[in-house]
Amino acid sequence: MPMAVKGEVIAGKPPLFGPASARAALGMEAETYVARAGEMMNRARAIVRDNRVQAIGLFEVKRFRLCNHFSRYRIFKHIQIFNLVIQHAPASSKVVAKAMKIYCIELGDTFSRYTNRWIGLKSNDWTDYRQDMLLTTEMMQASINAEIRAIRQLLMISSLYAD
């Protein structure tokens, strides 16, 4: 028999992420991380697409900044979202959160390998770098876009979770 829903509380227990305002704040923080990563990648892709080889010296610093940004985002979503869902949500949501967490780790490893692959980038590597950079950042953008949609869904249905 389904539990009766009374506003934000099911069976006398608060929702997983707290009140709607807390879920909204988590969602906004995740959206901010994704938007910032997108901005960083878009600026770098514009430089690479314009074949501005003379800007090659900037890319190492920018790659490490983006890598650090992705690391902060990973810590945020794992601790603030995925771990809570895995610990307290129904089985179907746990499966989703576990899969998202594993995929996130794999994606982070992929980006770290990309970052490390181009340490000490030289102008004679430009053609290979350009292709790798465009493919990697496009894949990362598509992945974080899909992930933020899934995070929105986890947060939206979290009002139904009870400990």
List each language-model region with its residue ranges.
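Small-residue-biased structural context
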Residues: 1-163
